[in-house]
Amino acid sequence: MSLRNSTTAKRFHSHKTWAGTFWSRPSLYFQPASIEELQAIVTRARDLGKTIMVVGSAHSPSDLTMTSQWLVNLDKLSKAVSFKPHTSGLYTDVTVEAGIRIHQLNEVLKRKGLAMQNLGSISDQSVAGIISTGTHGSSAYHGLVSQQIVSLTIMIASGELLTCSPDENPTLFRAALLSLGKLGIIVYATLRTVPAYTIHSTQHVITFETLIREWDNLWTASEYIRVWWFPYAERCILWRASKSELPLSAPRPSWYGTWLGRLFYETLLWVSVRLWPSLTPSVERFIFSRQYGMEDTLGSGTGSEAVQGSVEGLNMDCLFSQFVNEWGMPLDNGPDVLRALRAKIEAAAKDNIYYVHSPVEVRCSNMSVPDSGDRNVEPNTQEFSASRRGAITGNTLRPLLDINPRDRPYASPHGHVTNSNLTLYINATMYRPFGVNSPVGKWYRDFEGIVAEAGGKPHWAKNFLGPETAELKDNESEDGKMLGLKPIIDEWYGDDLKQWKSLREKYDPTGVFLSGKVWMDRNGLL
């Protein structure tokens, strides 16, 4: 077929990230509606020497998906294919076309009385996207969202479909669980889902000192947990949740969840970014007091409670366009890291060097894996029945490019989990009020220096700078520019990186999926 004249092809398409941080103009844009159409696109690209970039919601705020060649969006490959309930009734394996967005999948599962076991902060991404970028939620009893994946079907550069799982092509499976879209195109995914559930959450205002003092006791007390730190308010929000059979409640009131509150907040941010940077601490303190109040509510019985469906409880409002820079490190290092970040933030504000936005998001995951190589084809349903919390895993294999610490001792999601088993994620968000860039370079340089020293690695899909940040020029055009991980990546990933590169070359020898080659090169992935 002639792709240029095909209804799947579009010229003059402008592609940008959800946050508006980057944009590009691909020569052709495709939205295939069938596997056969997608195969034709891939084989034609190979024959013509073109490269393909695959994109879903474009929620990665980095230039990871920018291309001047062919861009393929999988939104029309969004069908649920099959449902396979386990005899125990504890889980159902669901196969879907991988272009389906998570919010669409949530609705499909809801109609079947099912739910995903764990979610990230949003549900806008595609299934292929959350797998390919290493998306995670926040729980001591769950790992990456891809921990729910039982098997994948990938279209490689020849147009052939390959199935991989813990039992079939397990090394390809490990590479595909965090592929960055460079091995091929995930067309089908089988996910391990569970009966629909509600979660009962409590939310408290705590001081920074309380967070540090209670660190050892916080992270494993509930199935789900997240902390938002507001440095200028010297307060944190502690949110914890567990599965519940209580009746649904009204959602929590939100001051900046209203149209007027949201507009007012974004306007104040715009003023502080464009006109009056030193106003930022006052803005952040004011907004915190309006949204949450300043009183420490932990232990006083005055915190808020809510019972919500799993999706509504685990997702959150990310507010405005933003830069995000998130790193994962051993959770035990958290108190020292946060103290060091606080000192940098306070010193920078005192000397009018830079100002940060809130919240700094603090989360955790259990990405420990068994040393035995147990591939967990059949999860231990008896363990889950006894604990009633944690993941019924689709696999227990570590992605080759997983950012989580390799030295965490293994703890079953249904067993005795301690802080030493866990990864800490710290996410530094900087808003772009009304599309205006906030200066991020100096803050992100300080941030990365501290988290890297603590054994951290950056989330692949976010706005990390890389270890050469000292070479950044202090001018607007270079502010926040990604220099990449090339100087350090071999040390960080070693044999796993070699294996990932070898598989990439094996299944894509002509480089069909090497679109965005500059990004790949600066991060040492070529």
Curated annotation (Swiss-Prot):
InterPro entries: ALO_C, FAD-bd_PCMH, FAD-bd_PCMH-like_sf, FAD-bd_PCMH_sub1, FAD-bd_PCMH_sub2, FAD_lactone_oxidase-like, Oxid_FAD_bind_N, Sugar_lactone_oxidase. GO terms for molecular function: D-arabinono-1,4-lactone oxidase activity; FAD binding; myosin V binding. It is found in: Mitochondrion membrane. Its EC number is 1.1.3.37. The modification Pros-8alpha-FAD histidine is found at residue 59. It catalyses: D-arabinono-1,4-lactone + O2 = dehydro-D-arabinono-1,4-lactone + H2O2 + H(+). Pathway: Cofactor biosynthesis; D-erythroascorbate biosynthesis; dehydro-D-arabinono-1,4-lactone from D-arabinose: step 2/2. One of its GO terms (biological process) is mitochondrion inheritance. It is an enzyme of class 1 (oxidoreductase). GO terms for cellular component: cytoplasmic side of mitochondrial outer membrane; mitochondrion. Pfam families: ALO, FAD_binding_4. Residues 22-196 form the FAD-binding PCMH-type domain. Keywords: FAD, Flavoprotein, Membrane, Mitochondrion, Oxidoreductase. SUPFAM superfamilies: FAD-binding/transporter-associated domain-like (SSF56176). Its cofactor is FAD. Belongs to the oxygen-dependent FAD-linked oxidoreductase family. This is D-arabinono-1,4-lactone oxidase. It comes from Yarrowia lipolytica (strain CLIB 122 / E 150) (Yeast). The lineage of its organism: Eukaryota, Fungi, Dikarya, Ascomycota, Saccharomycotina.
